[in-house]
Curated annotation (Swiss-Prot):
Name listed for the protein in its UniProt record: Delayed-rectifier potassium channel regulatory subunit KCNS1
Gene giving rise to this polypeptide: KCNS1
Naturally occurring in which organism (per UniProt): Saimiri boliviensis boliviensis
Complexes and interactors: Heterotetramer with KCNB1. Heterotetramer with KCNB2. Does not form homomultimers.
Keyword DNA damage attributed: no
Intramembrane segments: 412-423, 424-431
Function according to Swiss-Prot or TrEMBL: Potassium channel regulatory subunit that modulate the delayed rectifier voltage-gated potassium channel activity of KCNB1 and KCNB2 by altering their kinetics, expression levels, and shifting the half-inactivation potential to more polarized values. While it does not form functional channels on its own, it can form functional heterotetrameric channels with KCNB1 and KCNB2. Each regulatory subunit has unique regulatory properties that can lead to extensive inhibition, significant changes in kinetics, and/or substantial shifts in the voltage dependencies of the inactivation process.
Pfam family, one: Ion_trans
C-alpha cells in the first residue's frame, strides 16, 4: 500500500503506480513510488526523503524532508539527517519503532509556532509563554535569536532584559507577587535537613519560632521583645550623646584621675552602661541561638541578616579586648597603643549598625535591600551621571568664579558645590556671584533634575514590586491554617534531599502528562507540513 500526503490530506493506493495531476498544457505524469521499508525489515534505517513523524506533547504532525532540510542546524533537521536509530534516539525523548514516530516531551503550543517557522523561516513570540520559558524552548529546538521575526524581536529582547518576571507596576493582582517554586523548594530543603539531625523536630520548631513571627504566639512575643531591645539600644546610644551626659562623664573622669585611678571605667553613665550590657546579652543570645538552631552553618554565615546580627555585637567585644590591652599597659600605653583609644571610639561608633537589625522585622527594609540588590545597574548609571555632571559643571564654575575668591578656588573645592547642586540640596554655603557662574549653576541644577529622575523611576518601580511581593508572602503566612502548617512540617520529618529531588521529578512527569491530556485533539491521521 502506498500513501501520498499533499497539504495535510492523505491519499492511499494499493498499487505501486500513482497518477499525479496533469500539468497545464502538458501530458499525464505517471510516477512510480517505492515502498518504504517496514519497521521490522531490519535492513535500512530511513530514507533521506521520508517524512518525519513527530509527537510533541500529544500533538502529532508529519514534517516533510524538504522543509527540514532548509534548517539542518535545528533539532528536527539533525533528526532528519540522523544516520542511525541510536543517533536519532539521542535527539528525542522516545521513539516508537512500530509507528516510526518520534516523541518529545515539550510544550505543544511552542511546537505549533515551530511548524510555522519551518514554513516561513520566522519565529513569532507566544504570549502564553513567559520570556524565559520561550527562550528555553527555542534553545532546545536549536533556534537562535536570529530566527525571531522582526516584529517580535524587539519585544522579546526588552522583556528578557528589563522584565525578569512579568509584573505590572500599577497592579496588585496575585500573579505579580506569587512566590516562585524555587523559593518553596529552598524552604523544603532547609526543613528536610532537620530530619536526620539530632533533636531535629525540637530544633526545627525553635528555628521557626525565631525566624517566622507568624508561626505561633511565642514567635510573635519573641519578635516584639527583639524589636524593643533594638529600639532601647538605639535610644541609649542617642541619649549618651546629650551634652548633660557628656559633662557628667567628663567630671567623673577628672575626679577619677585626681584620685589616681584610670578614667576608662567611669566614662559611661551607670544606667546606660547596664542597659548596654543587657542589650548586648540579648543580641549575643540571638546570634548564638540562631547559629545553633540553623539547619546549615554555611548558609547561616551567607545570610545578610545574620551578618548584621554579628556586626551589631562585634564592636562591644572588640572594645573589651582593646580595654584589656590598655589595662595591661598600666593605663598609659606604649607607642604601639598610642591610638588604641581612637580605635575604641570607632568600635563604639559601629553600634549605629544595630538599627539594621530592624530589617528582620520590617518589610520595608527588606524590600529596600532586595531593590538595591537587583538595581545595581541603575544605581551605577545614577552615580556615573552624577560624576560626569559634577566634573563638567565644577570646571565651568571654577573658570567663572576663580577670580572672585568666594570658595571656588580649586576644581576639587567645586566638587562639593556641584554635588549639592545636582542633587538639588543647595546648602548655600558656596554660591556663584558672576553671571557666568549663575548660568553654570542653573544648568547644573536643571541637569541634576533630569539625570536623577531617570534612574530613580526604575528603582522606585522595583521597590514597589518587591514590597508588594513581600507583603503577599507575609499575608499568606498569616492567613494559613496553623494545623495545616503543622501537617506540612510533619510530612517532611525524615525526608532527605534525594527524596525531594525525586518528588520534583515526579511532579514534572505529572505536568508533562497534563500537557498530553490537555493537548488539542487530533484527527486519526497526522497532518503534513
Amino acid at each position: 500500500m502506498l500513501m501520498l500526503l499533499v497539504r495535510g490530506t492523505r491519499y492511499e493506493n494499493h498499487r505501486s503506480k500513482v497518477t499525479l495531476p496533469t500539468p497545464l498544457g502538458g501530458r499525464s505524469n505517471e510516477t512510480t513510488l517505492c515502498e518504504s521499508p517496514g519497521p521490522d525489515t531490519g535492513i535500512r534505517w530511513r530514507r533521506s526523503d521520508e517524512a518525519l513523524r513527530v509527537n510533541v506533547g500529544g500533538v502529532r504532525r508529519l514534517l516533510s524532508a524538504r522543509a527540514l532540510a532548509r534548517f539542518p542546524g535545528t533539532r528536527l533537521g539533525r533528526l532528519q539527517a540522523a544516520a542511525s536509530e541510536e543517533q536519532a534516539r539521542r535527539l528525542c525523548d522516545d521513539y516508537d519503532a512500530a509507528a516510526r514516530e518520534f516523541y518529545f516531551d515539550r510544550h505543544p503550543g511552542f511546537f505549533l509556532g515551530l511548524l510555522h517557522f519551518y514554513r516561513t523561516g520566522h519565529l513569532h513570540v507566544l504570549d502564553e509563554l513567559c520570556v524565559f520559558a520561550f527562550g528555553q524552548e527555542a534553545d532546545y529546538w536549536g533556534l537562535g535569536e536570529n530566527a525571531l521575526a522582526a516584529c517580535c524581536r524587539a519585544r522579546y529582547l526588552e522583556r528578557r532584559v528589563t522584565r525578569p518576571r512579568a509584573w505590572d507596576e500599577d497592579s496588585d493582582t496575585p500573579s505579580s507577587v506569587d512566590p516562585c517554586p524555587d523559593e518553596i523548594s529552598d524552604v523544603q530543603r532547609e526543613l528536610a535537613r532537620y530530619g536526620a539531625a539530632r533533636c531535629g523536630r525540637l530544633r526545627r520548631r525553635l528555628w521557626l519560632t525565631m525566624e517566622n513571627p507568624g508561626y505561633s504566639l511565642p514567635s510573635k512575643l519573641f519578635s516584639c521583645v527583639s524589636i524593643s531591645v533594638v529600639l532601647a539600644s538605639i535610644a541609649a546610644m542617642c541619649i549618651h550623646s546629650l551634652p548633660e551626659y557628656q559633662a557628667r562623664e567628663a567630671a567623673a573622669a577628672v575626679a577619677a584621675v585626681a584620685a589616681g585611678r584610670s578614667a576608662e571605667g567611669v566614662r559611661d553613665d551607670p544606667v546606660l552602661r547596664r542597659l548596654e550590657y543587657f542589650c548586648i546579652a540579648w543580641f549575643s543570645f540571638e546570634v548564638s541561638s540562631r547559629l545553633l538552631l540553623a539547619p546549615s552553618t554555611r548558609n547561616f554565615f551567607c545570610h545578610p541578616l545574620n551578618l548584621i546580627d554579628i556586626v551589631s555585637v562585634l564592636p562591644f567585644y572588640l572594645t573589651l579586648l582593646a580595654g584589656a590591652a590598655l589595662g595591661d599597659q598600666g593605663g598609659t600605653g606604649g607607642k604601639e597603643f598610642g591610638h588604641l583609644g581612637k580605635v575604641v571610639q570607632v568600635f563604639r561608633l559601629m553600634r549605629i549598625f544595630r538599627v539594621l537589625k530592624l530589617a528582620r522585622h520590617s518589610t520595608g527594609l527588606r524590600s529596600l535591600g532586595a531593590t538595591l540588590k537587583h538595581s545595581y545597574r541603575e544605581v551605577g548609571i545614577l552615580l556615573l551621571y552624577l560624576a560626569v555632571g559634577v566634573s563638567v559643571f565644577s570646571g565651568v564654575a571654577y573658570t567663572a568664579e576663580k577670580e572672585e575668591h568666594v570658595g571656588f578656588d580649586t576644581i576639587p573645592a567645586c566638587w562639593w558645590w556641584g554635588t549639592v547642586s545636582m542633587t538639588t540640596v543647595g546648602y548655600g554655603d558656596v554660591v556663584p556671584v558672576t553671571v557666568a557662574g549663575k548660568l553654570a549653576a542653573s544648568g547644573c541644577i536643571l541637569g541634576g533634575i533630569l539625570v536623577v529622575a531617570l534612574p530613580i523611576t526604575i528603582i522606585f518601580n522595583k521597590f514597589s514590586h518587591f514590597y508588594r511581593r513581600q507583603k503577599a508572602l507575609e499575608a499568606a503566612v498569616r492567613n494559613s491554617n496553623h494545623q495545616e502548617f503543622e501537617d506540612l512540617l510533619s510530612s517532611v520529618d525524615g525526608v532527605s534531599e534525594a527524596s525531594l529531588e525525586t518528588s520534583r521529578e515526579t511532579s514534572q512527569e505529572g505536568r508533562s502528562a497534563d500537557l498530553e491530556t490537555q493537548a488539542p485533539s487530533e484527527p486519526p491521521h497526522a497532518q503534513m507540513y
